[in-house]
Amino acid sequence: MKALSSIYLFILALTLGVEVAIGLSAPVLFRSDLYITPGTLSALQAGTLLAQVFMKYNYIALFCGFFALLFEIFSWRGSEASFGLKFSTLMLSLIIAVLACLFYYFTSYITAAAALGESAIDENFARIHEASETTLKIAMIARLGLFFLRAKISVFAPLKSKSK
């Protein structure tokens, strides 16, 4: 179980790293005029490129979300952690899995709308886009919380019991 816990923490950290990288690259793509010849990349083209990045990210987020949920479900009985800690990690993993599915839906919608061109970018598109950004931010916060709670259970709790 120790090796699987280490892999689990690595997957959570890796996904967080991908989310940070996406968060850093999105503004660069949408403000490409600051870095390359102005007019080289339209907002629609930048969005199309970023949508491809998000489609690939979705696979990582979905895998991480459902791996986390399954890990927390199956480790429930074997864990010596308090009920509150186990319940928190289970709920955070459920939130992460649900948000990954929601983000996948948003990305599919945004990609389909962008494929239709400028005419599809309306108020509804803007609301969906904003909701997808909020979803990603909440998922990052939940994943970060889950990482630290799981590290407390998997890494620090065994160290405490050995020192007694």
Task: Give the location of each predicted region.
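Interfacial loop at the N-terminal end of multi-pass membrane proteins
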Residues: K2-C64, S75, S119-D122
